[in-house]
Amino acid sequence: IPSGATINNQGTATNFGASGAVNWQTGSIKTGDFTAANGEGYFVDTSSGAVTMTLPSSPSAGDIVGVKDYALSFDTNALTINRNGEPINGFNALNPTVGDEGASIILVYVDGTKGWIPTVDDTSSLKGGTDYMAATGGTETECGNFKIHSFTGPGTFTVQQVGPLSNGKVDYQIVAGGGSGGARPGTSDNPGGGGGGGFRESKCATTSGTWTASPLANPTSQPVSASPGTYPIVVGAGGAGVSPCGTTNPGNASSAFGLTSAGGGGGGNYDSCGSVRSKSGGSGGGARGGGSTGNAGGAGNTPPVSPPQGQPGGGNSPSSPDQGGGGGGGATEAGVTGSPGPNGGGRGGAGATSGITGSPVSRSGGGGSVCGAASPDGSGTAGNRTGNTSNAADNRGGGSGSAMSGNNSGNGGSGIVIIRYRFQ
């Protein structure tokens, strides 16, 4: 046989450690889902879409099945092998996929412990499970050997398997919704900015590899039960913006694995409708301008957790007249205190920046009081004297800035839950 020649076997393959032989079904190329029979081999064409091959039910020792990538398309549309209740290579948690171009596999059923074992194959790692963790839920992405699940709304994180090389833990980021800033019909005594949503995070290198966590990361990862199961995920909405005289709204809490991040506090108002003090929360809302000087912003890290999930809102101007309101608190910095004058609103406090998804993203910054800037990381929004304030960005948990002159404040930003672990 010349060097480099390719042999196309369209007959019968024998032995391979099995008691039977593979009779290749050359007259019936499989382009859709099918159930395999003992002793048969199949050419599978996935060029038009993924295909699932279901292995025979109630197999006996020595049963044999073959499969070959007919169109060299498994790398585009993978073949899924449905275990049909039996292990593959001793694993019985997942139905494995074959995504290697040109793959050719002979599977022999050995016993109830190991199940089907590939004896002649291009993918010797094929097995019905993983040595690490397997799970589903949210939007799934990969970063090297690590998988990331991002939940931008309520959902379920389902652990299918915890393998023998897994430490049974995941890293997490739980961000609550941000609070709304105040709104006032007048042109003096700026309302306070909304507080950023509570921010909680863990990092354990043996769990999820090397990445840059926020300063708030808890070094002890939240353990996940070694038994497969489901974990409800709650993602909090941002507090709704208000019209002049409206009572500001806190953000809503986010939670996962029994851990909760509190919603950001609403900013304070002071106007002809009466005074509304800033509210506590994951991070506190900024103090209202006007009234007594030196009013404090809403408390952060409420209820208290360690490390703290947020910081207090900024106070109002310490002197009259025309006192500026305070900026909303952020995850890593208190809101800035207001200063005297019509443009004296404090800026929002800085949020927290984390690379848990593979790229750095800032979340849970505070909103600015009128004419006060947004949080320096951009997750909160600035105050506005002459128009409505902007809504804080979705899934970043920032507080919204406050408004004056009859304008409305924007919504706080919704939260997010992110989970990261090793999967291969």
Question: Model-predicted segments: where are they?
Answer:
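Glycine-biased low-complexity/repetitive sequence motifs
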Residues: 1-50, 57-424
